[in-house]
């Protein structure tokens, strides 16, 4: 059996921009993507801590060291600059992979600088 499991998370990031007229996605500082192990164009869920909104989109790489978390397209109606969010990526794993999975959690400060990277 295959299982859908969370494998990476960027926790309590602050949204820095929103562009309603961009063609979808979330732009994320490449340093954060690398730390979490999230690839460009990988599907991610966004959980808005501030207002409870939840949505699915894909990650686009942003400028390294910029701290950018940019909500693009229609999602800009739901998630606003200044909101705290959690970005989560899931993968499909077989039983053994799922049981041995050690998800990556990236904790950031209010400027989206990496504070800590946790495995498992």
Curated annotation (Swiss-Prot):
Record field: catalytic activity: L-aspartate + H(+) = beta-alanine + CO2
Enzyme class, UniProt record, top EC level: lyase
Major localisation: cytoplasm
Cofactor (UniProt): pyruvate
E.C. no: 4.1.1.11
Residues given in the record as substrate binding sites: 57, 73-75
InterPro entries noted in UniProt: Asp_de-COase-like_dom_sf, Asp_decarbox
Complexes and interactors: Heterooctamer of four alpha and four beta subunits.
Family: Belongs to the PanD family.
Protein name according to UniProt: Aspartate 1-decarboxylase
Species name: Thermus thermophilus (strain ATCC 27634 / DSM 579 / HB8)
Upper lineage: Bacteria, Thermotogati, Deinococcota, Deinococci, Thermales
Gene that this polypeptide is encoded by: panD
